[in-house]
Amino acid sequence: MAVPKRRKSRSNTRHRRSQWKAAAPDLVPIVVDGERRLVPRPLVRYFQQG
């Protein structure tokens, strides 16, 4: 039979959550319609296709 995990205190939960940071995407310069733009690397292909 399944056993519930130990409950974490509110303080521990909030300290753990506060350590999480979103990383900014690395932007690469590309030229679109003669204009230089900074776009996230995964989207470069779509910008070049049109």
From Swiss-Prot:
Q: Where is this region: Disordered?
A: 1-21
* Keyword Membrane attached: no
- Molecular function terms in GO for this entry? structural constituent of ribosome
Instruction: Tell me which Gene Ontology terms the entry assigns under biological process.
Output: translation
Biased composition regions of type Basic residues, renumbered to the chain? 1-19
Keywords assigned by UniProt, alphabetized: Ribonucleoprotein, Ribosomal protein
The keyword Ribosomal protein appears for this protein: yes
The record's section on SUPFAM superfamilies has:
Zn-binding ribosomal proteins
Q: Which NCBIfam families does the record associate with it?
A: rpmF_bact
Protein family according to the UniProt entry: Belongs to the bacterial ribosomal protein bL32 family.
Official protein name in the record:
Large ribosomal subunit protein bL32A
Tell me what organism the protein belongs to. Answer: Saccharopolyspora erythraea (strain ATCC 11635 / DSM 40517 / JCM 4748 / NBRC 13426 / NCIMB 8594 / NRRL 2338)
Query: Lineage in the entry?
Result: Bacteria, Bacillati, Actinomycetota, Actinomycetes, Pseudonocardiales
